[in-house]
Amino acid sequence: YHIEKYEEGRVKVFKIHKNIAVGRGINSDHPDEKYLEAFVGIIDEINPDIAHIQHLLYSSHRILDVMKERKIPIIYTLHDSWLECPKITKLMPDNSMCSGWSEEKCRDCISSSKIYISNDKMASLLSKIYGKFSMHRIFVNMVSIIKKILTWFGTGKKSAESDIKARYENMKKIIDSVNLFISPSQYLRSAFASW
């Protein structure tokens, strides 16, 4: 990881640059010891009074645990429906808007999606491929091919159901860790509050 440090006026800015080749399924947590270590180093250096999270997509959710352990209040800005919807968009397979979360509805929506691959299958296949192909372009192309193959064979509703349950518990943990949510729109605020 590359950590960039600079000041904007009197505000210290730290950026952790992390390259992402592919997501890890719908659960969206990316446990990564090096990322967490870099984050803890920054927290140790600045000892903040408050933390503002813009998004946790492709980040280790353990950073919230670190802040909670240190009693650092967390503010989270909502930008989309990521906490509620694994597809982020809340669009059903027929392109209608989802009317609200339910385990069964999410399972059916995700398992009917052409891009859904269970976390276990994706992790297993990517670990085999990543060892063979180090060039990013080849790696990404192989991921695309594997997604198509798995879609043809189907991953099944049972796999989607366990992924939905795990994701829901993970998102609930995130929500419980946050002290204050900020929403840029009344629509997003209402949708989040009703979830």
How would you describe each model-predicted region?
Residues 26-31, 51-53, 157-162:
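Short, flexible loop segments at the rims of nucleotide/cofactor-binding pockets, characterized by
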Residues 1-47, 110-144:
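A conserved catalytic-core segment of Leloir-type glycosyltransferases
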Residues 69, 96-180:
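Membrane-proximal helix-turn-helix segments that form the acceptor-binding/catalytic region
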Residues 41-59, 73-76:
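Short N-terminal targeting/anchoring amphipathic segment
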Residues 59-62, 189:
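Short, well-ordered alpha-helical microsegments
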Residues 82, 187-189:
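Alpha-helix capping/helix-boundary segments
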Residues 1-2, 86-91, 96-97, 195:
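Short aromatic-enriched loop/helix-cap "lid" or pocket-rim segments at secondary-structure transitions
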